[in-house]
UniProtKB/Swiss-Prot annotation:
InterPro entries: AAA+_ATPase, Chromosome_initiator_DnaA, Chromosome_initiator_DnaA-like, Chromosome_initiator_DnaA_CS, DnaA_C, DnaA_dom, DnaA_N_dom, DnaA_N_sf. GO terms for molecular function: ATP binding; ATP hydrolysis activity; DNA replication origin binding; lipid binding. Residues 81-117 are annotated as: Domain II. It holds the Pfam family Hda_lid. Domain I is involved in oligomerization and binding regulators, domain II is flexibile and of varying length in different bacteria, domain III forms the AAA+ region, while domain IV binds dsDNA. Residues 118-334 are annotated as: Domain III, AAA+ region. Residues 335-454 are annotated as: Domain IV, binds dsDNA. One of its GO terms (biological process) is DNA replication initiation. This is Chromosomal replication initiator protein DnaA. Keywords: ATP-binding, Cytoplasm, DNA replication, DNA-binding, Lipid-binding, Nucleotide-binding. Plays an essential role in the initiation and regulation of chromosomal replication. ATP-DnaA binds to the origin of replication (oriC) to initiate formation of the DNA replication initiation complex once per cell cycle. Binds the DnaA box (a 9 base pair repeat at the origin) and separates the double-stranded (ds)DNA. Forms a right-handed helical filament on oriC DNA; dsDNA binds to the exterior of the filament while single-stranded (ss)DNA is stabiized in the filament's interior. It comes from the Bacteria.
């Protein structure tokens, strides 16, 4: 057995299964072969159960045919295989694991050997669905891919969970390597940087660790907020950051938070995060959510009527990951029942998700959350007062109600002290103008959405 075992098995599954089934259930799996155990990591428990029930017997049959000696025991888990242990999850992922990374935990620190980029080839700019919520971040990322080490260095992308930040990082990596085949592009999570640093200290290989991280052409580091309250890691990254910038090597970072909002990180590091370009990815607006669903369904070989995509997108609003989870459930129900995809079918398949979302976000909840955020009374939100300290939060609350609930403009107006629909429409347009022009309003709106969607 070797590290191509799962890749060979996945290739056989790809040749036997319908494309829709393979893309939905097999392609997302990541594998770790450890002795006589082959662990398959799935994105969620629903996928684990489905693969176990529908495909495990076939997987075992293929493994028996591929193995000359003892067949590994297959274990299904929720999670991800670590990059250094990951087997090729599908034929398309083999290219992403062709390079070897120094193992600082074992003292193997030869920085001259080829390294693992950790870049997933399937994440590109072409399949990143663009909308108003992310178009600036995508445009900046494309500029970096075409001109690494240029004016947008460092690039700091922030936004809530599941909005596409990691996709953009991999797309940049693929773009850089497309322009320069031998580019040394390295994607990691901040947690991995911390682990490598700790291992290098334990094994007296800190010099090798420093040379390795400072030798890359582009460092793409995800979830930079993980450095919070880790002073040693912050100190090392501070010097790594400076060395890379001095060498015109590209740095791209992502975080759930705006740099200045990351508690537990030194001010000098926060300041450096903003030296280049800091840009937000917002929760996708309705049109983008529809486009994402249509694209993802098409990738799975599934025809989704536009009105069905609109129905789902109108009710599930928080992030792309939530939409993908809903789509996976729809696909599974289609395969299980053979029924056509209609609004009634989707309403039944997603009834618990929709009910949870509608229970979570109500106009009343929005009003209370906005009042608390701005430290004003709920009665002020509902009053006729027109002072800016009250009028602006009221307009924000109206705009949030339009975006996060299914209520009509007249219904929203009625909930805000009997105002008419034109007042609500004006508030929504005004807030959009302010979001485009004023960073603080944009941040307030983003923070409120995050609070209401959590």
């Amino acid at each position: 057995m070797n590290n191509s075992l799962w890749q060979q098995c996945a290739e056989r599954l790809q040749s036997e299964l319908p494309l829709q089934q393979f893309n939905t259930w097999i392609r997302p799996l990541q594998a770790k072969l450890n002795g006589e155990t082959l662990t398959l990591f799935a994105p969620n428990i629903y996928s684990v159960d489905w693969v176990r029930d529908k495909y495990l017997k076939t997987i075992n049959t293929y493994l028996e045919a591929l193995c000359d000696d003892k067949v590994p025991n297959v274990v299904l888990k929720v999670g991800e295989a670590s990059p250094t242990q990951r087997d090729s999850g599908s034929p398309q992922r083999a290219a992403a694991t062709r390079r070897k990374t120094p193992n600082f935990s074992s003292g193997n620190t030869d920085v001259e050997v080829p390294f693992e980029s950790n870049i997933h080839p399937e994440y590109t700019f072409d399949n990143f669905v663009e909308g108003k919520s992310n178009q600036l971040a995508r445009a900046a990322a494309i500029q970096v891919a075409e001109n690494p080490g240029g004016v947008y260095n460092p690039l700091f992308v922030y936004g809530g969970t599941g909005l596409g930040k990691t996709h953009l990082l991999h797309a940049v990596g693929n773009g850089i390597m497309a322009h320069k085949k031998d580019a040394k592009v390295f994607y990691i999570r901040a947690e991995r940087f911390v682990q490598d640093m700790v291992n290098s200290i334990r094994n007296s290989s800190t010099n090798e660790f420093k040379r390795y991280y400072r030798s890359v052409d582009a460092l793409l580091i995800d979830d930079i907020h993980f450095f919070a309250n880790k002073k040693g890691s912050q100190e090392e990254f501070f010097h790594t950051f400076n060395a890379l910038l001095e060498g015109n090597q590209q740095i791209i970072m992502t975080s759930d938070l705006y740099p200045k909002e990351i508690d537990g990180v030194e001010d000098r590091l926060k300041s450096r995060f903003g030296w280049g370009l800091t840009i937000a990815i917002e929760p996708p607006e309705l049109e983008t959510r529809v486009a994402i669903l249509m694209r993802k369904a098409d990738e799975r070989g599934l025809h989704m009527p536009h009105e069905v995509a609109f129905f789902i997108a109108k009710r599930l609003r928080s992030n792309v990951r939530e939409l993908e989870g809903a789509l996976n459930r729809v696909v599974a129900n289609v395969q299980l029942t053979g029924r056509p995809i209609t609004i009634d079918f989707v309403r039944e398949a997603l009834r618990d998700l929709i009910a949870a979302q509608e229970k979570l976000v109500t106009i009343d909840n929005i009003q209370k959350t906005v009042a608390e955020y701005y430290n004003i009374k709920l009665a002020d939100i509902l009053s006729k007062r027109r002072s800016r300290s009250v009028a602006r939060p009221r307009q924000l609350a109206m705009a949030l109600a339009k975006e996060l609930t299914n209520h009509s403009l007249p219904e929203i107006g009625d909930a805000f002290g009997g105002r008419d629909h034109t007042t609500v429409l004006h508030a929504c347009r005004k807030i959009q103008e302010l979001k485009d022009a004023q960073h603080d309003i944009k941040e307030d709106y983003r923070n409120l959405i995050r609070t209401l969607s959590s």
